[in-house]
Amino acid sequence: VVFSYSGSPEAAERLAAETGSTAVQADSADRDGVISLVRDSGPLDVLVVNAGIALFGDALEQDSDAIDRLFRINIHSPYHASVEAARRMPEGGRIIVIGSVNGDRMPVPGMAAYALSKSALQGLARGLARDFGPRGITVNVVQPGPIDTDANPENGPMKELMHNFMAIKRHGRPEEVAGMVAWLAGPEASFVTGAMHTIDGAFGA
């Protein structure tokens, strides 16, 4: 198992030691770096793309360079990583991209670019599923809603606003998302491809 990280090298190395995996620092905005990372990882059975950033603010006032960086990380990186991984995958490989329920629903202002980037992943999965299907390689998107992480803690300032949109009024847990990813990576999901798998407590319902 190889995973990449951007910051927090100490946390990455701890995780690598605990799991017997290899941590590689990488910039997901760097196309050539993303391609090299996948290429240098050797033969791949499963690729999980989990890099992403968000921007908040009025679209009329946002910095164009920041928007371009968001698109490089949230759209270009998953595309190039997926294509490069497919070159190295055996028949029956798995590509799983972590998107967001905001690809389906954006109920608040100030996140147009983020929502666009997550909607783009839906087209990526549908298109690459057609391209890679003859080799039995599946391509799916997991679309979490609010998940209790350092980036979006349940006790954060957005809790009440987000929970008002949800049927299950709590943040999801990382292990719930991981369970969906593990199922998609397994043999039971060999006929599941080009699909969006939303895990959001009905945030998008």
Please place each PLM-identified region on the residue numbering.
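C-terminal substrate-recognition "lid" of short-chain dehydrogenase/reductases
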Residues: 88, 170-199, 203-204
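Conserved glycine-rich Rossmann-like NAD(P)H-binding loop of the short-chain dehydrogenase/reductase
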Residues: 1-12
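The beta1-alpha1 cofactor-binding region of Rossmann-like NAD(H)/NADP(H)-dependent oxidoreductases
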Residues: 25-36, 64, 175
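Active-site loop-to-helix junction immediately N-terminal to the catalytic Tyr of the SDR YXXXK motif
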Residues: 62, 106-115, 127
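Alpha-helical segment proximal to the catalytic Tyr-Lys
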Residues: 87, 130-134, 190
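Substrate-binding pocket helix/loop in short-chain dehydrogenase/reductase
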Residues: 58-59, 63-71, 162
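Active-site helix of classical SDR
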Residues: 82, 117, 125
